[in-house]
Swiss-Prot record:
Name assigned to this protein: Neurotrimin
Cystine pairings recorded for this chain: C57-C115, C157-C201, C243-C295
Record organism: Rattus norvegicus (Rat)
Signal peptide: 1-32
Keyword Glycoprotein: yes
List of glycosylated residues: N44, N70, N152, N216, N284, N292, N305, N321
Primary localization class, coarse: membrane
Membrane topology: Lipid-anchor; GPI-anchor
Pfam families assigned to the protein according to its UniProt record, in alphabetical order: I-set, ig, Ig_3
Similarity comment: Belongs to the immunoglobulin superfamily. IgLON family.
């Protein structure tokens, strides 16, 4: 649809037959194009949506009548406007140039425009094609998603523009891994926790700056205890047991000793829970406090636990991830092996 396609006067916006009646193209005379040095319109005109397009036609003093047409619709004939569209204005009508301007160009203005002239001999025409470029726009994109580890996901990013924009997906957090897809659709099979974070969709077509939208992907997984730290503390001193767990959603922590849960508020003991960390603090350690404690981390997807020792000085030499060994066993074992070798 051209510039007059949506608003016209029935008695003015005429087809080419009407133009023949104006003697620009006399009935029965074939229209010639490109067989003379005039009229000479511009080459293809490319403008961005919303800008103004100027259509120029070079003529000379042999021209008696001149007009601009959009397909079969007359826009201007000489100084007379034949189209009601207020965006179409006459810029110049001289012996050497006949120019019009289309303001605030839109995509429906795209198409062929013809400069038609009448001389003493015969009519001539010259054609120019108006190309309208449109900045990229993302019209549809997936919402933020929460999914369990191991499942499949599909992200969608639909963009429009002229020329058709190129769509790319990029994983930008927590670790930038570069482009992951050059397509409107991003498929991830068996997603892992490392693939969580923000995914950026970019649409570009060199008409304007790329447009960017982001989707946040949350990958849920059961707790994993990454550190279970015991400690050796003399009687009467302050001691802390620490348990760290990675999980999404964040883990909830509980502490047990001899199958009994330790609760906040017990005299001399404090339980401090954070999203990925729990501390069990003894402000005045007694002999009764020594022993094995169990840290339990859980969320809706599962749970895990680790054993941690609170011990006196010299009682335990190594505590890590819920394992402990008596210090005496560490140095007695080499002596026992040496004794057996000497005996035999």
């Amino acid at each position: 649809m051209g510039v007059c396609g949506y608003l016209f006067l029935p008695w003015k916006c005429l087809v080419v037959v009407s133009l023949r009646l104006l003697f620009l193209v006399p009935t029965g005379v074939p229209v010639r194009s490109g067989d003379a040095t005039f009229p000479k319109a511009m080459d293809n005109v490319t403008v961005r949506q919303g800008e103004s397009a100027t259509l120029r036609c070079t003529i000379d003093n042999r021209v008696t009548r001149v007009a601009w047409l959009n397909r079969s619709t007359i826009l201007y004939a000489g100084n007379d406007k034949w189209c009601l569209d207020p965006r179409v204005v006459l810029l110049s009508n001289t012996q050497t140039q006949y120019s019009i301007e289309i303001q605030n160009v839109d995509v429906y203005d795209e198409g062929p425009y013809t400069c038609s002239v009448q001389t003493d001999n015969h009519p001539k025409t010259s054609r120019v094609h108006l190309i309208v470029q449109v900045s990229p726009k993302i019209v549809e994109i997936s919402s933020d998603i929460s999914i369990n580890e191991g499942n499949n996901i599909s992200l969608t990013c639909i963009a429009t523009g002229r020329p058709e924009p190129t769509v790319t997906w990029r994983h930008i957090s927590p670790k930038a891994v570069g482009f992951v897809s050059e397509d409107e659709y991003l498929e991830i099979q068996g997603i892992t926790r490392e693939q969580s974070g923000e995914y950026e969709c970019s649409a570009s077509n060199d008409v304007a700056a790329p447009v960017v939208r982001r989707v946040n992907v949350t990958v849920n997984y059961p707790p994993y205890i990454s550190e279970a730290k015991g400690t050796g503390v003399p009687v009467g001193q302050k001691g802390t047991l620490q348990c760290e767990a990675s999980a999404v959603p964040s883990a909830e922590f509980q502490w047990f000793k001899d199958d009994k849960r330790l609760v906040e508020g017990k005299k001399g003991v404090k339980v401090e829970n954070r999203p990925f960390l729990s501390r069990l603090t003894f402000f005045n350690v007694s002999e009764h406090d020594y022993g094995n404690y169990t840290c339990v981390a859980s969320n809706k997807l599962g749970h895990t636990n680790a054993s941690i020792m609170l011990f006196g000085p010299g009682a335990v030499s190594e505590v890590n991830n819920g394992t402990s060994r008596r210090a005496g066993c560490i140095w007695l074992l080499p002596l026992l092996v040496l004794h057996l070798l000497l005996k035999f």
